[in-house]
């Protein structure tokens, strides 16, 4: 039987662009693993994407996954926009390069082995796991140690 996994994510950026961090919780059968890391210069959208990517990349086998995010950018991007971006060679409808394409490609690859259900939760509305992820992300953003090599000013 396929493992049933829950993932909760959040990203934070102090300035946007500025120092940023992500936080994620991976839950399986009552056990939890948390992830967070801070970056010197990045954006909130990149950190929202990184939270989902890092948690998914931690899975060692195919799983049924429910991912909860407060990011409409991530949820809509992966459930609605990515199919056309790929068809257009990673261009938007107005033929501009997709922002954060490095992370969208990485997220797409990380999803490929799993059955995914995306759930949107309202941020800062008392959702316990979202609040914990927000705390993890903000703590990481306040102590950045990584360089976001994929960040491009203006994205």
UniProtKB/Swiss-Prot annotation:
Signal peptide: none annotated. It is an enzyme of class 3 (hydrolase). It comes from the Bacteria. It is found in: Cytoplasm. Binds 1 Mg(2+) ion per subunit. May bind a second metal ion at a regulatory site, or after substrate binding. Its EC number is 3.1.26.4. One of its GO terms (cellular component) is cytoplasm. Endonuclease that specifically degrades the RNA of RNA-DNA hybrids. Monomer. This is Ribonuclease H. It comes from Enterobacter sp. (strain 638).
